[in-house]
């Protein structure tokens, strides 16, 4: 008997009817003990094992609310200290919803800035 090549096998499949292909697949499942559901589950488990969680290394400090206007001077001083911005830019920040104070900084630096701003009454989020 001649060796069955992949090309010959595919050519033979092309000549089969749909019913014959289904019978072939069922025969292969029975002969080799293949459970289609088990293949699907194990394939997804392999994908899950390959996925690695990347730890975030850069953070942004976002001020949701600067607090009362009675704290305006401490807020301006603190934001100036953190950003180095001038008065005009700080005023624009104070009037901006979800103002980004710092971007692409370490988690430790973001926590430090958050604590400074929360001490003066601001609502801060780290992303």
Swiss-Prot record:
It comes from the Bacteria. GO terms for biological process: translation. One of its GO terms (cellular component) is cytosolic large ribosomal subunit. The keyword Signal does not apply. This is Large ribosomal subunit protein bL12. Homodimer. Part of the ribosomal stalk of the 50S ribosomal subunit. Forms a multimeric L10(L12)X complex, where L10 forms an elongated spine to which 2 to 4 L12 dimers bind in a sequential fashion. Binds GTP-bound translation factors. Keywords: Ribonucleoprotein, Ribosomal protein. Forms part of the ribosomal stalk which helps the ribosome interact with GTP-bound translation factors. Is thus essential for accurate translation. NCBIfam families: L12. The keyword Ribosomal protein applies. GO terms for molecular function: mRNA binding; structural constituent of ribosome. Gene3D superfamilies: 3.30.1390.10, Single helix bin (1.20.5.710). Belongs to the bacterial ribosomal protein bL12 family. Pfam families: Ribosomal_L12 (PF00542), Ribosomal_L12_N (PF16320). PANTHER family: 39S RIBOSOMAL PROTEIN L12 (PTHR45987), LARGE RIBOSOMAL SUBUNIT PROTEIN BL12M (PTHR45987:SF4).
């Amino acid at each position: 008997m001649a060796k069955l090549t992949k090309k010959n096998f595919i050519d033979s499949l092309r000549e089969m009817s749909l019913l014959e292909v289904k019978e072939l697949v069922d025969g292969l499942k029975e002969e080799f003990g293949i459970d289609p559901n088990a293949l699907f589950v194990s394939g997804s488990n392999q994908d899950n094992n390959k996925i690695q969680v990347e730890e975030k290394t850069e953070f942004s400090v976002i001020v949701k609310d600067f607090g009362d206007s009675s704290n305006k001077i401490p807020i301006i001083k603190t934001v100036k200290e953190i950003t180095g911005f001038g008065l005009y830019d700080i005023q624009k920040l104070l009037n901006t919803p979800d103002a980004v104070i710092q971007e692409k900084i370490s988690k430790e630096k973001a926590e430090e800035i958050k604590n400074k701003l929360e001490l003066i009454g601001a609502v801060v989020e780290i992303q």
